[in-house]
């Protein structure tokens, strides 16, 4: 029986690392990507030779092409692409936001995701086999103050996932979109608040949030469904989180 080859972007921490561990435990070979070559080397030493580190900046199209071209024999046909790499930067209102933060979110969450998808997909189509699992967010569905461009990028990911399904109709390639809510145990809020650990910690204070291992379990479950079953979307929140109420601003 052929071993499944997965490619997981943003593999150095959080969801990505948990997904890599879970897939390897299940017998997969995993290509883990990220910008931090030293961190990927550490993960390789922990997970063994079923983990192949691939260091590059997903925002850079040519770097992505070059990295994929270095894949050794036996690793070139990707059966499962997990588009996990992404970030949020800042929580300021739109008129105060840093444009560079906006550009970085667009380049990573949208440009990086579509680039690697476009590069991996033709081989899946040629084999009529594969699955793409995109990590989006409930921020792509439910607006909140300060989400502005971050929420916009995740709305793009969700709609792109659905449109991929339309493009791939008639093939055996599956596409799923995972939309997490409040998740702890990652670098998400530390990155969003530019390294302000105290502010980041307050986001998860006194809340039992979803953990990276929960998302990893969902990813594995999605891929292990029968080939004729495609789960289009999964929206997942901690039990403590619910839908935000509509904001009303009253005149003083």
Swiss-Prot record:
| Residue positions of the active site | 150 (proton acceptor)
**What does the record give as EC number?**
1.1.1.-
Task: Recite the UniProt keywords alphabetically.
Answer: NADP, Oxidoreductase
Q: What class of enzyme is it?
A: oxidoreductase
Output the Pfam families linked to this UniProt entry. Answer: adh_short
Question: Would you tell me the Gene Ontology cellular component terms?
Answer: cytosol
Database matches in InterPro entries = NAD(P)-bd_dom_sf, Sc_DH/Rdtase_CS, SDR_fam
Among SUPFAM superfamilies, the record links this protein to: NAD(P)-binding Rossmann-fold domains (SSF51735)
Sites binding NADP(+) sit at 7-31
Q: Which residues bind substrate?
A: 137
GO MF terms held by the record: oxidoreductase activity
Q: Which family does it belong to?
A: Belongs to the short-chain dehydrogenases/reductases (SDR) family.
Protein name, as recorded: Probable NADP-dependent dehydrogenase HI_1430
Q: What is the lineage of its organism?
A: Bacteria, Pseudomonadati, Pseudomonadota, Gammaproteobacteria, Pasteurellales
């Amino acid at each position: 029986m052929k071993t499944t080859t997965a490619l997981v972007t943003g593999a150095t921490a959080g969801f990505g690392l948990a997904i890599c561990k879970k897939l390897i435990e299940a017998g997969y070979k995993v290509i883990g990507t990220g910008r931090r070559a030293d961190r990927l080397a550490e993960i390789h030493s922990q997970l063994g030779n079923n983990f192949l580190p691939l260091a590059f900046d997903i925002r850079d199209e040519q770097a992505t092409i070059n990295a994929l071209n270095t894949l050794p024999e036996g690793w070139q046909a990707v059966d499962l692409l997990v588009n996990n790499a992404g970030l949020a930067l800042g929580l300021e209102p739109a008129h105060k936001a840093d444009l560079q933060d906006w550009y970085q979110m667009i380049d990573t969450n949208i440009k990086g995701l579509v680039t690697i998808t476009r590069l991996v997909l033709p081989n899946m189509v040629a084999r009529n086999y594969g699955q793409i699992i995109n990590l989006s967010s409930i921020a792509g569905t439910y607006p909140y103050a300060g989400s502005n461009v971050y929420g916009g990028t995740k709305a793009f990911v969700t709609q792109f996932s659905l449109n991929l399904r339309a493009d791939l109709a008639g093939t055996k390639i599956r596409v799923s979109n995972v939309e997490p809510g409040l998740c702890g145990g990652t670098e998400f809020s530390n990155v969003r608040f530019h390294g302000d650990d105290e502010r980041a910690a307050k986001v998860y204070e006194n809340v039992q949030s979803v953990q990276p291992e929960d998302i990893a379990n969902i990813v594995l479950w999605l891929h292990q469904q029968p080939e004729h079953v495609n789960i289009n979307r999964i929206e997942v929140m901690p039990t403590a989180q619910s839908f935000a109420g509509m904001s009303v601003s009253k005149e003083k």
